[in-house]
Amino acid sequence: MLTSSSHHGRSYDVFLSFRGEDTRKTFVGHLFNALIEKGIHTFMDDKELKRGKSISSELMKAIGESRFAVVVFSKNYASSTWCLEELVKILEIHEKFELIVVPVFYDVDPSTVRKQNGEYAVCFTKFEANLVDDRDKVLRWREALTKVANISGHDLRNTYNGDESKCIQQILKDIFDKFCFSISITNRDLVGIESQIKKLSSLLRMDLKGVRLVGIWGMGGVGKTTAARALFNRYYQNFESACFLEDVKEYLQHHTLLYLQKTLLSKLLKVEFVDCTDTEEMCVILKRRLCSKKVLVVLDDVNHNDQLDKLVGAEDWFGSGSRIVITTRDMKLLKNHDVHETYEIKVLEKDEAIELFNLHAFKRSSPEKEFKELLNLVVDYTGGLPLALKVLGSLLYKEDLDVWISTIDRLKDNPEGEIMATLKISFDGLRDYEKSIFLDIACFFRGYNQRDMTALFHASGFHPVLGVKTLVEKSLIFILEDKIQMHDLMQEMGRQIAVQESPMRRIYRPEDVKDACIGDMRKEAIEGLLLTEPEQFEEGELEYMYSAEALKKTRRLRILVKEYYNRGFDEPVAYLPNSLLWLEWRNYSSNSFPSNFEPSKLVYLTMKGSSIIELWNGAKRLAFLTTLDLSYCHKLIQTPDFRMITNLERLILSSCDALVEVHPSVGFLKNLILLNMDHCISLERLPAIIQSECLEVLDLNYCFNLKMFPEVERNMTHLKKLDLTSTGIRELPASIEHLSSLENLQMHSCNQLVSLPSSIWRFRNLKISECEKLGSLPEIHGNSNCTRELILKLVSIKELPTSIGNLTSLNFLEICNCKTISSLSSSIWGLTSLTTLKLLDCRKLKNLPGIPNAINHLSGHGLQLLLTLEQPTIYERLDLLRIIDMSWCSCISSLPHNIWMLKFLRILCISYCSRLEYLPENLGHLEHLEELLADGTGILRLPSSVARLNKLEVLSFRKKFAIGPKVQYSSSMLNLPDDVFGSLGSLGSVVKLNLSGNGFCNLPETMNQLFCLEYLDITFCQRLEALPELPPSIKELYVDEHLALRIMEDLVIKCKELNLIAVTKIEYQNFYRWLDSIWSDVSELLENSQKQQLDDMLQLIPFSYLSTAKREEVLKIVIHGTRIPEWFRWQDRSATTMSVNLPEYWYTENFLGFAICCSCCFYHSARSYDVEFEGSMHHYNYDSSYWKEYEEPSYDFYERDSIEITAKLTPRHKGMRTEELKKVCSFSMNVLRRATAVPNMCFAFFPFNSLCHISNLQANNPNDYGIFETCLSPGDIRHRGKQWGFNLVYKDETGGSVTHEMLINR
């Protein structure tokens, strides 16, 4: 038997698929005997099936445990559904890279199989007639035949002229060749690689005929070779020949390139080494011999251009359809060789990294409980690098906790040698200046801005453009959002190299700093110094470190970074080396720099939080300085003279409290890009003129005392952001019009601003808010096509400019909370580009003179005096209007009769228009209406014409808010007629229906005709005692508890799509009384919530029905409560993950699924609510002991999108070929908020089919899975009162359900 089979834990080498009546006693019989004679363990159904076994299950299992599948196509093969199902399974495993398919065309042409014509067409005609209800199955059969027929195989009639003996011998040869050829990959290696292979497959473009070269690149140990192996195994049988040359770089350490050329040719042509002594001559031979062959070649770990030139020189070396795959650490090699596509392999995501580590450290996908915390430390250390995960996982396999702890401590100082050696290979190939750049980044500058680094390296003479480019191409660093980054382990490697330098030039470790500054270390060699921890210094040592005597010895010091506070050290610094290029000194204690400090090549200077009063007297020539940061220097009273700092790009003076003015020369810095002076609260004056032509950002935020803005020169065309928030500026100069590129103008809380120049309309976006003294806006002279967006909030204007219509490009206008505005200019008609008009809470606005024709979105939220759109002619022109939002408009008592003319309206929101009591009868003419939102209105009846709204998807007539700000409650809902929604049944397009808080007794029987309905909310409908039959499309149901208990069983059975039931506890008639009592007597509410109503509800769920083959979705229930039922066998209060070893035979035919329950308290960020009831307001606070018990102040759940519960089954033993089964369900915050701010119980039932489809059970025994794990995320949930647990659910003798605990007791 071939050893490869047993090595991989496979039961068979070859699986034979054939039509018995055609070939069992002829071709297949002979092939089977030949395979057995050669020692190839072969599965043939009549030879291997054991008595009493299910034939189908046995076959499926045999396919999954085979290395090869030989499919013998004969005339009657397609007539057997058994054969076709077998073929589908073969293809499924083949596409997971785990099975090699060898098609044999016995007495049919390959095109007959591929196209299903001839004899196969007759079979499929019958199938399509007999399997009308299962067309998907027929399509799967067709697809499988087509795909397998496209694999290179053996055509007995045409290739072998009918000679069965020759054909069988060639099949044997191919199998032997491919056993030696195919590169093994364990399941552990494939973690996280599936998505990468999918992407690489798309880059190969197997559908194209030409030659295609694909490059795979990335840092060492990231998984390039693994990806290439998986890709090779997936596709090599589609080529005439294939060769995987592994580790070319290492291979050439022991052999010549000529030898490698000969190896490549020998493997591709299956010939002996050719007699040749010259690489150039060998190139000619390779091209001549391979130019007509379709080949797959993988060159792994290439590191030199010559290797590519001599092995895969050009496209014309290979035949049409050939594919060349190259893996390398150096992307530049791929560019130089003109590969068609490149793909970078990235490190693993956290969950994938944990899985890979577990498979090596524990030989399974889940860890042992006591190692979980340490596991995360190790995985975080690796940064998701597969090599590191494998090495450390194998190192810690079967070790105890003490060894783990010791290893983690050791890794901090001495990284694992094998990992570092692999990473260092790329570093060793660098030029000296490239090595210097890399070491500077690793020791000091990871995460720094690329522009700053370029300036530093240029001043250091390191050729930064070429150097940084090379480091990126070799995967040693990467650029992310203009910052230079590197992998954690790459930084460890770089720092390790820096420590081993002799003498040390870069000092970054605290233990080395002391020796460097006051010890015997050669100080004259030091180029970089990082000072981080003063605690290491004894009394007097810190003073010496900063003394002139010590610092004068650091003559070559380029980089000085001090990150800590001085902590009692107040002595002046007497000396700083003039060699400094980068000086970063936080909390510098001196008032100024030493007088002899002349750093002529200084590039970067930051002195955040220092005691500097002035940097130096007079002007200094600092021609290389690009960044000066003096932020939080609270004593700074004077800025330097900038006349000789001509290349300054960024000047940051943020929060310099004592600064009254800046040097006038700042206005003439031609290269200045950023000037940040925010929170300079004493600043009174800027230079009279600013002509910094490169300036892009000017931030004067919170400069309260700044009264005047300077004149702007014409060359100021690059400024994009100007922030004047909370300044004391009274007016802006007309010359501001020269800021032609301004995109972001912030004028928030400019309390002294009284006027704006007309040039303000030259800016694209204008947002003016809380400018209390601004009484008017300037007129627009002539048409202006600049301003696109205008937002006015809390300003004191009484009207818009009469010339507002001249803003011909304005497309967004929002006027919010402007309490004095009473009218809009009639020229608003002229806003021909206006698509959005929002008039929000402008309570004195009396009329809307017109609506521009282009309007798309019209909002009049909260308007009190607006005489609604009564003009009969305006609707004829509003063909583009899609959204009308008139919510909270208490003045509206009716909608215009002509609203029906808005035929393209999609959303109509009239919620909380309390005086609105009816809808127009012609509402049904809004034939494109998709959402009708009428919450909290006085509407008592839907017009019959709504039956015509055949595109309506959302219908909401909620009569109250869920608990939250401004809760509104109306007694009108108690007396609604039962036929208020009589037309519902005709709204077949409705997807979401909200009837919460209504007082009707019945819903129409036609509800079951809402075939698209997925969301139904009937909470707080106290008078509703029963439900009509609901449509089977329902997915989410929000319902009161009294109703849920009555309908649960019937609902689950009939609504096949149902996956969420959210249950509320509060009875409608007690709603107001409950609000009054919740804050004063919370303990009683809490006691009631713990009556275990969930237990009663769960007894009603037909779990047996949920576990049928047709139901694969998780059922979720949300209900009030704090304690989970006792029958949840495995429970926890602290951990967010639980893992248990299942009993040996936990799975039986009666097993239904896994039940998981979690109690959590989700609360609102508001601390009080206003409730309106029959005209009076009531205010409620909930700062009670109850909330203090359940709140976690450091965590607000509303910042999360959802809470997720995961169920996962893992194989019992290592080496099993079964993959883990996993299913995730989520409870969105929108659902959990509806539980009225009391503790929630989240219950999830995972039918076994949701983890493992019933068809998979034919190939896998569920009892092979011995570990069940469930986790609750987000994983940082840490609030008091949380409890959760799970159990296994089985079917009992009566058809009901029992838990595993109950089963054991029986």
UniProtKB/Swiss-Prot annotation:
Catalytic activity: NAD(+) + H2O = ADP-D-ribose + nicotinamide + H(+); NAD(+) = 2'cADPR + nicotinamide + H(+)
Superkingdom field: Eukaryota
Site (Important for ADPR cyclization): W82
Residues that hold NAD(+) according to the record: R19, G20, E21, D22, T23, R24, G52
Keywords attached to this entry: Hydrolase, Leucine-rich repeat, NAD, Plant defense, Repeat
Active site: E86
Pfam families: C-JID (PF20160), LRR_13 (PF23286), NB-ARC (PF00931), TIR (PF01582), WHD_ROQ1 (PF23282)
EC category name: hydrolase
GO annotation terms (biological process): defense response; signal transduction
InterPro entries reported for this sequence: Apaf_helical (IPR042197), C-JID (IPR045344), Disease_R_plants (IPR044974), LRR_dom_sf (IPR032675), NB-ARC (IPR002182), P-loop_NTPase (IPR027417), TIR_dom (IPR000157), Toll_tir_struct_dom_sf (IPR035897)
Annotated EC: 3.2.2.-, 3.2.2.6
A single MF term (Gene Ontology): NAD+ nucleosidase activity, cyclic ADP-ribose generating
TIR domain: residues covered: 10-179
Effect on the protein upon substituting W82A: Loss of NAD(+) hydrolase activity
Gene3D superfamilies, alphabetized: Helical domain of apoptotic protease-activating factors, P-loop containing nucleotide triphosphate hydrolases, Ribonuclease Inhibitor, Toll/interleukin-1 receptor homology (TIR) domain
Ranges for the LRR repeats: 200-224, 252-275, 417-440, 599-622, 645-669, 670-693, 716-739, 741-763, 784-807, 808-831, 832-857, 878-902, 904-926, 927-949, 961-983, 987-1010, 1013-1036, 1045-1070
Domain NB-ARC as annotated: residue spans: 198-417
Domain observations: The TIR domain mediates NAD(+) hydrolase (NADase) activity. Self-association of TIR domains is required for NADase activity. The TIR domain alone is active and (slowly) produces 2'cADPR.
Subunit record text: Homodimer.
Function: Disease resistance (R) protein that specifically recognizes the Xanthomonas and Pseudomonas effector proteins XopQ and HopQ1, and triggers cell death. An NAD(+) hydrolase (NADase): in response to activation, catalyzes cleavage of NAD(+) into ADP-D-ribose (ADPR) and nicotinamide; NAD(+) cleavage triggers a defense system that promotes cell death. Makes small amounts of 2' cyclic ADPR (2'cADPR).
Family note: Belongs to the disease resistance TIR-NB-LRR family.
The protein's name: Disease resistance protein Roq1
